[in-house]
């Protein structure tokens, strides 16, 4: 265990806990402003190794960052254009939704009545309103266009962060009373978070591609969208892969049938088994140093504090908190509670 950098007595701990509550309330209140900055910071952490690799090949840092950001902007434009097209196509196919779902409901009606549930298809049809879904999709398209400005500001922030990286060590050293120990702790946090995010991103990309290929092979509509969803939600520990499987399974169940939905379910189970339970633990190596319970609770906490982005980044944020606690006398015991002793 590292030697404590900060010494705290009992009274200071109580005072700091009170301050912590106030700070957390402030963060939650200002989440709309803070979340883009945090997201940009973690994107910069993912991209910085690529920039460093280009710099080692004697590419000027400004040029390396410019090339990387240009590629990302082009990819984002193509991705948003495709998503807009997919949502438009989904809007056009919505009238089929009501007719497709009525067939299984008609087959289900006698079974429900047989077990004592008195319900008619006409009553259920009253609650199936495709107009509500069309309104929802229209709002999504509007939000997608509005998100362009937010994405531009986010990428601009990432750009300046990547350009600022060489100056950060010197700035941090001037801020610290004990720069050697402090920089060691910061470097450890950066290495841990970077290791997790880079590997998690690689695994998520492969997961999304495999899900896309599986759905395309089964002739599922919007397979690319569901593959993209599998990529994004794979960052959420424990439940992300489950959430990613629900929309395509529901779509296939409504439009294709029960057996086709079972086939898609089996495909997702196989993907999660191979990547979530076999490949990812092997690639991650010794692990994150966090217990399984802490990973799940951090998902809830950061989701409450920062919203969906907090859920996506719950693990790296908790890693940073754990390393910070290890550098304080009063926080080392809390850091032990967060740890997985089997992986220490």
From Swiss-Prot:
Q: Which GO terms describe its biological process?
A: autoinducer AI-2 transmembrane transport; quorum sensing; transmembrane transport
Q: Which residues lie on this side of the membrane: Periplasmic?
A: 26-30, 83-149, 218-221, 279-292
Q: Where is the signal peptide?
A: none
Taken from the record's topology, the Cytoplasmic segments are 1-4, 52-61, 171-196, 243-257, 314-344
| Phenotype upon gene inactivation | Cells have a decreased extracellular and increased intracellular concentration of AI-2. Deletion of tqsA results in a 7000-fold increase in biofilm thickness and 574-fold increase in biomass in flow cells. Deletion of tqsA increases cell motility by increasing transcription of flagellar genes. The tqsA deletion mutant shows higher resistance toward crystal violet, spectinomycin, streptomycin sulfate, 2,6-dichloroquinone-4-chloroimide, chloramphenicol and amoxicillin.
Output the Pfam families linked to this UniProt entry. Answer: AI-2E_transport
This protein's GO cellular component annotations are:
plasma membrane
Under the heading InterPro entries, the entry gives: AI-2E-like (IPR002549)
Q: What is its main location?
A: membrane
Q: Transmembrane stretches, by residue range?
A: 5-25, 31-51, 62-82, 150-170, 197-217, 222-242, 258-278, 293-313
Q: What GO MF terms are annotated?
A: efflux transmembrane transporter activity
Q: Where in or outside the cell?
A: Cell inner membrane
Q: Which UniProt keywords apply?
A: Cell inner membrane, Cell membrane, Membrane, Quorum sensing, Transmembrane, Transmembrane helix, Transport
Instruction: Tell me where on the tree of life, at the top rank, the source sits.
Output: Bacteria
Q: State the function annotated in the UniProt record.
A: Involved in the transport of the quorum-sensing signal autoinducer 2 (AI-2). Controls the transport of AI-2 either by enhancing its secretion or inhibiting its uptake and consequently represses biofilm formation and motility and affects the global gene expression in biofilms.
Q: What family does the Swiss-Prot or TrEMBL record give for this protein?
A: Belongs to the autoinducer-2 exporter (AI-2E) (TC 2.A.86) family.
Protein name in UniProt: AI-2 transport protein TqsA
Species name for this entry? Answer: Escherichia coli (strain K12)
Q: What is the lineage of its organism?
A: Bacteria, Pseudomonadati, Pseudomonadota, Gammaproteobacteria, Enterobacterales
């Amino acid at each position: 265990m590292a030697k404590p950098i900060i010494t705290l007595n009992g009274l200071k701990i109580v005072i700091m806990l009170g301050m912590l509550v106030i700070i957390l309330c402030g963060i939650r209140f200002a989440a709309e402003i803070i979340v883009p900055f945090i997201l940009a910071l973690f994107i910069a952490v993912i991209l910085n190794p690529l920039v460093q690799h280009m710099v080692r090949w004697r590419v000027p840092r400004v040029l390396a960052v410019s090339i990387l950001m240009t590629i990302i902007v082009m990819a984002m434009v193509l991705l948003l254009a495709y998503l807009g097209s997919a949502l438009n196509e989904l809007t056009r196919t919505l009238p089929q939704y009501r007719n497709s779902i009525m067939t299984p409901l008609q087959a289900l009606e006698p079974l429900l009545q047989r077990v004592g549930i008195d319900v008619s298809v006409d009553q259920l049809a009253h609650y199936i309103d495709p107009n509500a879904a069309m309104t929802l999709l229209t709002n999504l398209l509007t939000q997608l266009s509005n998100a362009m400005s937010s994405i531009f500001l986010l990428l601009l922030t990432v750009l300046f962060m990547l350009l600022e990286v060489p100056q950060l060590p010197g700035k941090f050293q001037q801020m610290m009373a004990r720069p050697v120990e402090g920089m060691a702790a910061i470097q450890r946090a950066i290495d841990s978070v970077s290791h997790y995010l880079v590997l998690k991103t690689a695994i998520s990309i492969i997961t999304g591609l495999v899900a896309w290929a599986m759905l395309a092979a089964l002739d599922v509509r919007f397979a690319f969208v569901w593959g993209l969803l599998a990529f994004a939600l794979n960052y959420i520990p424990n439940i992300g892969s489950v959430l990613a499987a629900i929309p395509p399974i529901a779509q296939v169940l409504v439009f294709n049938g029960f057996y086709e939905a079972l086939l898609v379910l089996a495909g997702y189970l196989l993907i999660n088994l191979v990547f979530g339970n076999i490949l990812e633990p092997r690639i991650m190596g010794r692990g994150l140093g966090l217990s399984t319970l802490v990973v799940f609770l951090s998902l809830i906490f950061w989701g409450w504090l920062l919203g969906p982005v907090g859920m996506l980044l719950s693990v790296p944020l908790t890693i940073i908190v754990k390393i910070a606690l290890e550098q304080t006398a009063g926080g080392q015991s809390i850091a032990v509670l967060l740890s997985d002793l089997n992986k220490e």
